[in-house]
Amino acid sequence: MGGSSRRQRSTSATRRDDKRRRRQCFSSVADDEEETTSIYGVSSIFIWILATSSLILVISSPSSNTSIQSSSYDRITTKHLLDNISPTFKMYTDSNNRNFDEVNHQHQQEQDFNGQSKYDYPQFNRPMGLRWRDDQRMMEYFMSNGPVETVPVMPILTEHPPASPFGRGPSTERPTTSSRYEYSSPSLEDIDLIDVLWRSDIAGEKGTRQVAPADQYECDLQTLTEKSTVAPLTAEENARYEDLSKGFYNGFFESFNNNQYQQKHQQQQREQIKTPTLEHPTQKAELEDDLFDEDLAQLFEDVSREEGQLNQLFDNKQQHPVINNVSLSEGIVYNQANLTEMQEMRDSCNQVSISTIPTTSTAQPETLFNVTDSQTVEQWLPTEVVPNDVFPTSNYAYIGMQNDSLQAVVSNGQIDYDHSYQSTGQTPLSPLIIGSSGRQQQTQTSPGSVTVTATATQSLFDPYHSQRHSFSDCTTDSSSTCSRLSSESPRYTSESSTGTHESRFYGKLAPSSGSRYQRSSSPRSSQSSIKIARVVPLASGQRKRGRQSKDEQLASDNELPVSAFQISEMSLSELQQVLKNESLSEYQRQLIRKIRRRGKNKVAARTCRQRRTDRHDKMSHYI
């Protein structure tokens, strides 16, 4: 009984304890439910906002007073966010936090090891989802991090200077040549620097050698100097040349720019010269190199003396003594050595009379060149040289011209006229004269009493025959006239080149072989390659007997440089070359065009007749 009663009491006590525990547990659970319900209500709101709108909560920057509250608030918010989201996102967040802590720990170790971080921005430990940018704090961090390294900036042409709150102000460390940097436009030196840099960039792109700025400076000066020798420089190039030359030759003209220094230096040198003794012999040697007024006076005095040192350089002072203050006519001494045909003629600048000139002149004209040595004079003296020895296939004939009038021949400036006439008092020749050597000579006398002689077999050679081709009329003063003859003509031969003078076809229908006008191989050939012939007009102005055309007579009457046959047969380029001659008058040019047109018409008519004859012959052949 006793055991059972004790067992019942323990059972009832156990039941009472269980009831008591149940009541305590129920009260605690109720309290917990109230607390969790309120918290679960707040967390559900955050979860709904994050899930529906995917917004990132941006909270303003916390102040220094509320730093503790913000940190506790961050912890509470993070706890509830991580407790009420999915397990996958919670695992992802935990892994990110662990990785972020590992990275911060590793970065802290590297910073402790290196002494300074390689990053210039601070590392903020903030959870995901809450971010803000504190510009003021970051700017303070950058400014307090230490001296900022200067970055070399190339000059750039800008309209206005950059205006930025983070920009640095003007400093003397900038790589520029401007002294005052508050100006928006660059200086001239900046522009020159930009030009040099541009040239270097272009040279680098092209793969050529990059020239240094100093070399470019001298190269520009050298280029302008070379250009000034060829063509005149422009105003801009002249200004640039002066600027470059001033900079290049600044050291050379430095002592001459300072007049006071120069005067003082000369005064010191003169004082040293006046002193009887010198301390150093080297100073005496240096002073002897400089010439002063006294030395120049001694030099001029030595020049004026006959037995001076400079006069000993002249070997022929006895033959040609020095004459001072003389005119040109008094100073020129004419003798056989320096006398030429051009000096022999009377000129407006020469007051020497022709009568004072020695008359010992040969039949052959002297040389026109200024060579008066004995070897050259003997070379041009009359010798038994025929043209075939020099030109084997030539048809040249020497034509000597003599002045038979009493008036003196005056030079008109033409070489082919000056050297051809000689002032000799020979009598006029008859129309047909037999020379002393038995050679036939035939002459033709013009109205101006100038005799033209053509020789059959030449014993003299005229070296100036190729220079006698002139497009200008041979005119002189009123005292004499000019009439010339060329032995070579495109259709007419010289009367002395054949023995059948009585033939009516002579000089008209029987031209000599090789005397026709030969067209030049190149249309750009010079005027000297064209053989110029001229028909000699008769004294009465009448046409010759035979089939001489009207155009040939017009060409000879108007002194055209070429014949009518040449005008009609020459190429267009050669015709333009003849028309460009400045010595031709407008009437002569019109006459040349007229003869050309009629010559072409004659050729066309001849071709037409030939075609008609050929067609008639073919028809008769078939019939």
UniProtKB/Swiss-Prot annotation:
GO terms for biological process: ATF6-mediated unfolded protein response; cell fate specification; cellular detoxification; defense response to bacterium; defense response to Gram-negative bacterium; determination of adult lifespan; digestive tract development; embryonic digestive tract development. Residues 435-449, 472-498, 511-529 have a biased composition (Low complexity). Its main location: nucleus. Residues 540-623 are annotated as: Basic motif. It is found in: Nucleus; Cytoplasm. Changing residue 237 to K: In lax188; small body size, transcriptional up-regulation of genes related to metabolism and adaptation to starvation, increased length of the reproductive period and slower growth recovery following starvation-induced arrest at the L1 larval stage. Residues 173-184 have a biased composition (Polar residues). The modification Phosphoserine is found at residues 164, 430. It comes from the Eukaryota. Disruption phenotype: RNAi-mediated knockdown of all isoforms results in a severe reduction in transcription of gst-4, gst-5, gst-7 and gcs-1 mRNAs during infection by P.aeruginosa or P.faecalis. Susceptibility to P.aeruginosa and P.faecalis is characterized by a decrease in survival rate. One of its GO terms (cellular component) is endoplasmic reticulum. Postembryonic intestinal cells. The keyword Protease does not apply. GO terms for molecular function: DNA-binding transcription factor activity; DNA-binding transcription factor activity, RNA polymerase II-specific; Hsp70 protein binding; RNA polymerase II cis-regulatory region sequence-specific DNA binding; RNA polymerase II transcription regulatory region sequence-specific DNA binding; sequence-specific DNA binding. Residues 1-29, 158-184, 421-451, 467-557 are annotated as: Disordered. Keywords: Activator, Cytoplasm, Developmental protein, DNA-binding, Mitochondrion, Nucleus, Phosphoprotein, Stress response, Transcription, Transcription regulation, Translation regulation. The keyword Disulfide bond does not apply. Changing residue 164 to A: Abolishes phosphorylation by pmk-1. Loss of nuclear translocation and increased susceptibility in response to arsenite treatment. Loss of nuclear translocation in a trx-1(ok1449) mutant background. Alternative DNA-binding strategy due to lack of a leucine zipper dimerization segment: DNA binding domain binds to its cognate half-site, an N-terminal arm recognizes adjacent 5' AT-rich sequences in the minor groove and the intervening residues stabilize interactions of these two subdomains with DNA. Monomer. Interacts with GATA factor elt-3; interaction may enhance transcriptional activation of target genes. Belongs to the bZIP family. Skn1 subfamily. Transcription factor. Required to specify the fate of ventral blastomeres in the early embryo, and postembryonically for the development of the intestine. Directly regulates expression of zygotically expressed med-1 and med-2 to direct mesendoderm development. In response to oxidative stress and anoxia, required to up-regulate expression of stl-1 mRNA. Involved in regulating innate immunity, acting downstream of the pmk-1 p38/MAPK pathway and probably also downstream of nipi-3. This is Protein skinhead-1.
